Amino acid sequence: VLILAAGNGGGPRGGRLDDDRLRQLRLAAQRLTPETAAADVSAAARAVVGVQAQDVRAAGLALRSRVPGLCRADVDGSRLIRTWTVRGTVHLIDPADRPWLHAVLGPRNLARFDTAMRQRGDYDVAVTMLGDLVAVLGDCPLDRAGLLRELAARGHPGLGQRSVNVLMPWAAAQGLVAGLPDGRYRAAEPPPAVDAELALATLARRYLAGYGPAAAADLA
C-alpha cells in the first residue's frame, strides 16, 4: 500500500508498509500506545485535531484512552472548546487550533447550516435572535435548556430543541459561539483570520501526523 506520512520537516513522505506495521504506526500516531500517550487533554486533542464530542461522555473516554490517569474533572476543567469541525460534526479541540480550523471549515459549515436553517424555515427567525443569543451566552455559560429559557424571556418563546440543534452550529460557524467540555455554551470572539491556503496546508500536515500513515485519497 502506497502511503504518506508526515516527514521530520513537516512535509509528506511516501513509502510502502504491510498491514501490521501500518496499524502499529496509526495507533502510535493517535496516541493510543503507552509509549506515545499524551501528557494532558490539550496535547491529546491537538494530536488528533480534536476528538468526536457529539456525546460529551464518549469524548471524555476518547481523551482518557490517550492520557493516563485522566478523570472527568480534568476534562471539564480544561480549556478545550466543543465546536463543529470536520463533516459539520461536534469535536473537542484545543483553542490554539480554532483559528486555522475555522479558516478551513467555517465557510463550508456555515453554508451547510444556512441550508438546514432555510429548509426548516428558521433562517429569518435565527437572524433576528442572533444578537440576543450572543448576549445571553455572554452573561454566563448555559446548557441548551437554560438557553431556551433565557431566549424565551427575551421574546423568543417559539424556539424548540430541534431549532437549537441547528441554531448553535450556525452561530458557531460564524465564530460567535463556542461550547465548553461539560456541554454548556458561551459567547466567543470570532477567531483571528488565517490565510486559507496556509490553513489547508496545516490541516494536511496535522492529519498526517495524527492519523497517518495515510493514502493520498484520505486527504481528499
Question: Model-flagged regions — what are they?
Answer:
Residues 2-157:
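Phosphate-backbone binding and catalysis cores of DNA-processing enzymes
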